[in-house]
Amino acid sequence: DFLHANDRKGQTPGSGNSLDVDGRHGKVARRAAHILRDAVRLMLTKHQSVQVINARGNHDPDAAVSMEIALEAYFEKEPRVTVQRNDCKIQHFQWGNVCHFVYHGEKNRAHQLAHLTNRYREQIGQSQFVYVDNGHVHHKQREELGPCLFEVWNALTASDQYHADALYGASRSISSVVYHKQFGEVSRNVCDLRIIRQEAD
């Protein structure tokens, strides 16, 4: 849901919920593509390679594909960047003993677990650590189910009118997690929105 809205209608494609949007969709999409591009450039200053996964959400499933295409075109001649295609809503990658899934999280965890263990049985069986990242509800949650550790991450975004009226709200932060190829998660950093604002001033 990086763009929050899929197109200029400003509604969720599935349910038609109204979304608060600021400005024209093209303007927002262009800015979003530039932010993602700059984030990848910054990562390249610190890492040998960057793998980009932009999971499709329920607010912007088509716009997310456009972001993927824009990044793919921009980094076409950069061998250190891989932009993973988001044809499937569940994205995954394997790295040593770590199998990692990225899914927006509209479906409940039991449904996700059933799908993952059925479709990715071989990858999960080869891995000592299985992580599933979700974001849909924005409330920090962490739960082990079967072989998988599910984690729901906070977002930086403010609640829009629909979610505020429904009394939804969560802490606003961004996190980074470091995974060891053999030992799984080894460290994490959390940055609250207030820190980001203070540093920006």
Which residue stretches match the model-derived regions?
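Core catalytic region of metal-dependent phosphoesterases/phosphodiesterases
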Residues: D1-V81
